[in-house]
């Protein structure tokens, strides 16, 4: 029997209404002793937490602390002792965690009201009222989904939602090494967002430069891998190709090698004194080393080309089965009409592939926006202009890493993370809703 909180509170008896203040009261009155005691125990734990820590955490959240660490002279020992001050980071974390606990308690209190009202209705209708043992048994039968989802949902809230809110809140503080705000920091409102969007500041210029390159990189990395992957898969699948399993194995072999190992090897090979430049010099083809990582244009092209070697095998895996499922009648009809291979590829193969793999393309584009490994392990964002925090090959995700780990601009790093999330979330949803895979799930014509 499903009931709503508003209905339960409005139509319930006095004990049901009081359950919002004393969770479990209605259950105790209705003879559900164990359930009532459990609700009261949860309330007691909540009250103890709020008295001992929660109220203080909430009270300090608006100011984020003000007492700095101090040196105090100990006359007895004849030395200076350090007295710990406030830690704004912990105050922020504990304050947000307290808000989560309060919300969780409100949900429990609302559940107690609904439970009491449900018990009231069952009594009025003369229906069977479950004992505690029967309620527990129902968790393995009709309410199995509730038991199975409890742990995963709790994990998402604690390890995903809570850190996400914590990170977002940092964007509204001055938490950075600037003016020594790494221990004590304050709320600054939208100042960090203004700094990021100000094209006249060094940070603002870096943001728009990195953002533009990130989009260019994601487009090339996604569609070049996709198109070349389809072409290679077509070559392997065509009737005249021998040893198809062998060729697939060769391409898939690169996936088996840990990516960070292969990228570091490629970085070493393409270095100024790497094997590629040495071989080309010895062959007399060049007189000075090619600037694979020291010239911005060369570095960007290098990253895109190396990504082809990494990404094409994944595309081959993805599209091989789909290519084999394209109806042969379409190709036979095209042969009757006198279409050549190129026309069949443009008019049949690509439209069918785009119809089926549009969601895959969107997720791949999103993954490339956040592709940390290839850029950081291959170029580390280089080359970097003097005084700049971002390099010419930095993506938003690698720049965010540098801003937080290398430069300790945690507030600006949080802003970059928020902007990346907003762009990806809105962009992905809008594009997905416009695809034929979403609009027409029935089939391909």
Predicted regions mapped to residue ranges:
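Transmembrane-helix bundle segments that line or gate the permeation/cavity pathway
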Residues: 31, 42, 53-69, 100
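A structural signal for multi-pass alpha-helical bundles of membrane permease subunits
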Residues: 53-63, 113, 144-445
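Membrane-interfacial interhelical loops
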Residues: 57-95
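N-terminal signal-anchor/first transmembrane alpha helix
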Residues: 2-16, 21-29, 33-50, 80-172, ...
């Amino acid at each position: 029997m499903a009931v709503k909180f508003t209905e339960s509170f409005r139509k319930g008896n006095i004990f049901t209404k009081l359950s919002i203040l004393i969770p479990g009261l209605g259950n105790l009155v209705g003879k559900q002793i164990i359930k009532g005691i459990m609700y009261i125990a949860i309330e007691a734990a909540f009250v103890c937490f709020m008295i001992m820590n929660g109220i203080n955490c909430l009270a300090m959240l608006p100011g984020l602390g003000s007492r700095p660490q101090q040196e105090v002279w100990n006359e007895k020992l004849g030395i200076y002792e350090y007295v710990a001050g406030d830690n704004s980071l912990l105050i922020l974390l504990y304050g947000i965690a307290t808000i989560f606990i309060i919300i969780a308690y409100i949900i429990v209190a609302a559940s107690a009201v609904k439970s009491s009202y449900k018990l009231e209705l069952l009594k009025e209708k003369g229906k069977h009222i479950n004992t505690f043992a029967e309620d527990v048994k129902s968790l393995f039968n009709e309410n199995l989904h509730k038991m199975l989802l409890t742990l995963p949902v709790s994990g998402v809230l604690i390890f995903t939602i809570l850190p996400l809110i914590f990170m977002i809140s940092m964007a509204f503080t001055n938490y950075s090494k600037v003016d020594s705000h790494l221990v004590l920091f304050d709320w600054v409102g939208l100042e960090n967002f203004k700094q990021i969007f100000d094209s006249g500041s060094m940070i603002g210029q870096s943001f728009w430069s990195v953002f533009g390159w990130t989009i260019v990189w994601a487009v090339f990395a996604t569609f070049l891998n996709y198109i070349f992957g389809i072409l290679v898969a077509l070559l392997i699948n065509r009737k005249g190709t021998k040893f198809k399993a062998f060729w697939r194995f060769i391409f898939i072999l690169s996936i088996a090698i840990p990516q960070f190992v292969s990228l570091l090897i490629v970085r070493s090979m393409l270095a100024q004194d790497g094997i590629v430049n040495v071989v080309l010099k010895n062959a007399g083809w060049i007189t000075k080393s090619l600037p694979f990582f020291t010239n911005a244009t060369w570095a960007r092209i290098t990253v895109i080309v190396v990504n082809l070697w990494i990404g094409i095998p994944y595309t081959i895996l993805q599209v091989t089965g789909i290519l084999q499922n394209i109806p042969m009648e379409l190709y036979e009809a095209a042969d009757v009409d006198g279409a050549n291979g190129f026309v069949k590829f443009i008019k049949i193969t690509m439209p069918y592939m785009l119809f089926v793999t549009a969601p895959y393309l969107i997720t791949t584009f999103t993954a490339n926006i956040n592709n940390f490994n290839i850029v950081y392990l291959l170029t580390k964002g280089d080359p970097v202009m003097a005084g700049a925090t971002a390099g010419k090959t930095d993506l938003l995700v690698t720049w965010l890493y540098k801003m937080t780990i290398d430069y300790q601009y945690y507030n600006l790093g949080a802003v970059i993370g928020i902007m990346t999330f907003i762009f990806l979330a809105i962009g992905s949803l809008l594009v997905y809703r416009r695809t034929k895979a979403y609009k027409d799930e029935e089939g391909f014509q």
